[in-house]
């Protein structure tokens, strides 16, 4: 992993982990260690792939579509990891993941 990729991963973790972990705790799906582990785990899976493919993007729409795929993958993984069962909870989790990814993407575009 390049130094730039590590900086981008650190930024992503710094923004998304507190948001998603806090949400999981407030929803009472998991305790603090599980909330942090899940939030870190999904980002360690998705971020390197997104970072690698995004270097070749020529359009902002490519980034938007790639982020949509990341949100879907992270939501599915967190639903499984945290044993989220209710459909409404799954939708709510997806919205939290959208918010976290939007925040980290916006910050990344501003500072990197």
Task: Write out the residue ranges for each language-model feature.
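Juxtamembrane/disordered regions of integral membrane proteins
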Residues: 1-112
